[in-house]
Amino acid sequence: MTWETVIGLEIHVQLNTKSKIFSGASTAFGAEPNAHAGVVECALPGVLPVMNREVVEKAIKLGLALDAKINRKNVFDRKNYFYPDLPKGYQISQLDLPIVEHGKLEIVVGDDVKTINVTRAHMEEDAGKSVHEGLNGATGIDLNRAGTPLLEVVSEPEMRSAAEAVAYAKALHSLVTWLNICDGNMAEGSFRVDANVSVRPKGQAEFGTRREIKNLNSFRFLEQAINYEAEAQIEILEDGGKVQQATMLFDPEKGETRVMRLKEDAHDYRYFPDPDLLPVIISDDRLQKAKAEMPELPKEMAARFVADYGVSDYDARLLTASRVQAAYFEEAAKESGQGKLTANWMNGELAATLNKEGMELADSPITAPRLAALVGKIADGTLSSKLAKKAFEAMWAEPEASIAEIIEKHGLQQMTDTGAIEAMVDEVLANNAKAVEQFKSGNEKALNAIVGQVMKASKGKANPAQVQELIKAKLA
């Protein structure tokens, strides 16, 4: 039997506000335990929650970017459950009236473009966390994270592979960081993924029983967890068993999922409207203001890069993966006047070097103006592609040096003396009679071999196109 995996994601996006969603306590990461535990988060008697306006603004911004419906009336609900890191005994969330509904997000997997529908995004508060390390077998409670504003973004179960789920998560991560509503730091818990996974026979309309894998904080873990869970469910079904609805944890060391608890449904949480919070009404003026303040979105910018700079759709998607990358490209392309060549170098040599060095683009010793200068020297014929790579390496190692200084210091200028190049061509032709005969017999590969010999003789400084023209002229 052929099985199909069905995946839906619930992603917790931690909003980068300075204060918490219902109190003025700080959201700064890394403080001493409970240093930012406010009176609301501690559930002290008589304290009341006060809505953080900025949370609403950021939620609207995401809704607009997802081309979603923005609900004008927002009601908060209490989600009741007992856990030590939740002193109130309930979490303030949104059940029936989320701020964002019916959005969509485009993903790319290989050569395929697919649109995933976003069911909803609702505002809620984060819980605290339990601390087990260094307490001699006891458990401590840290409420610094409690009350931190979250947007829980829920997709439709429309992904059919771990690769599609990762592409969706990456696309949403890119979007929320682009909008500057989340810092995207997965290691610090700013972007956490819950994956709902089920399997069914290929062609069956009815969904299988889903299991939810909680708190995946890297794209690699997301992929591993989904693949393992899908295989585990298939094995259960093929052995004649039944998959039980459950909440799962992923063990990254073993690369496997395990049951944390049997899954609860919404009625288990006894939701009811929070009597301490008035509905949040979004006016026409507020919505129009939010629309006017929206930045150019990645998809729009990618289309502009294709139109204005002549880059491919693929390159444009890479260049708009982040605002930093897009701004770098646009600055370098404008300065050099060479959009396509700039894109090739950014997505090629520069990206590879950054990856090798474990660096971010913002920290690159080759700034946008320096890359523009390098690209300009390639475009005007001063540097061949081979010499340009050597120049790039030198520029990386010597961040203060100009491209002119690099070329002079390392002797990288391309040969322009036609007479000297012609003499090298004559010598190579004389010493490679076999290759010459092969080329005359129609073997195009022989031409590449001859060009290679001339380039070797010139130590890479001859212009390959010029060399090829000279060889063809002499052998015509």
From Swiss-Prot:
Domain of life: Bacteria
Organism lineage string: Bacteria, Pseudomonadati, Pseudomonadota, Betaproteobacteria, Neisseriales
Quaternary assembly: Heterotrimer of A, B and C subunits.
InterPro entries, sorted: Asn/Gln-tRNA_amidoTrfase_suB/E (IPR017959), Asn/Gln-tRNA_Trfase_suB/E_cat (IPR006075), Asn/Gln_amidotransferase (IPR018027), Asn/Gln_tRNA_amidoTrase-B-like (IPR003789), GatB (IPR004413), GatB_C_1 (IPR042114), GatB_Yqey_C_2 (IPR023168), Gln-tRNA_amidoTrfase_suB_CS (IPR017958)
EC number: 6.3.5.-
Molecular function terms from GO: asparaginyl-tRNA synthase (glutamine-hydrolyzing) activity; ATP binding; glutaminyl-tRNA synthase (glutamine-hydrolyzing) activity
Family recorded in the similarity comment: Belongs to the GatB/GatE family. GatB subfamily.
Function text: Allows the formation of correctly charged Asn-tRNA(Asn) or Gln-tRNA(Gln) through the transamidation of misacylated Asp-tRNA(Asn) or Glu-tRNA(Gln) in organisms which lack either or both of asparaginyl-tRNA or glutaminyl-tRNA synthetases. The reaction takes place in the presence of glutamine and ATP through an activated phospho-Asp-tRNA(Asn) or phospho-Glu-tRNA(Gln).
Enzyme class: ligase
GO biological process: glutaminyl-tRNAGln biosynthesis via transamidation; translation
SUPFAM superfamilies to which the protein is assigned, alphabetical: GatB/YqeY motif, Glutamine synthetase/guanido kinase
Protein name stated in the entry: Aspartyl/glutamyl-tRNA(Asn/Gln) amidotransferase subunit B
Reactions accelerated catalytically: L-glutamyl-tRNA(Gln) + L-glutamine + ATP + H2O = L-glutaminyl-tRNA(Gln) + L-glutamate + ADP + phosphate + H(+); L-aspartyl-tRNA(Asn) + L-glutamine + ATP + H2O = L-asparaginyl-tRNA(Asn) + L-glutamate + ADP + phosphate + 2 H(+)
Organism per entry: Neisseria meningitidis serogroup A / serotype 4A (strain DSM 15465 / Z2491)
Record key words, sorted: ATP-binding, Ligase, Nucleotide-binding, Protein biosynthesis
